[in-house]
Amino acid sequence: FRPFEFARGMRRATLVTSGFVHADMPHLLFNMLTFWFFGPPLEGRIGTPLFVLLYASGLLVSQYGSYRKQRHNPDYATLGASGAISAVLFAYIVYWPTSTLILLFLPIPIPAPLFGIAYLAYTWWSARQSRDRINHDAHLGGALTGLAFVALFDPQAYGRAISLVTG
């Protein structure tokens, strides 16, 4: 996805197709492992139609930050499913707030809500730094999309999550 070209009416399909291409094998592997761990239980919980809508929304909405920031930069391009995967992960966290997550590179169990807060803080900070080749705006946009999606389609889930965490 090239925001500069998209803003000028060119290569519009890349808004979607870029979500099916990854920079390298570790990028693809990490996204697909995350999807494999969190996608099936979430799909079972919300149903296939809403799951597909969540994934598609995460993919599309997560590009907005990149678009806003990079639409005047002809050299910027981004790809990968990380925004959609972040949407799935954060919807999962709302539905299973008492679960623990274990990062592959840091094998320490982390409570899901704590992971979510740390992830949001880190991606927000990293998006402001722009020091690496990771699209932190897409990660942040996807995570927020997942949270908003649950609020829109199952607002009672937040009350259940709070009760589970505090109860």
Q: Model regions: which residues?
A:
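A detector for small-residue-rich transmembrane helices and their helix-helix packing motifs
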Residues: 1-167
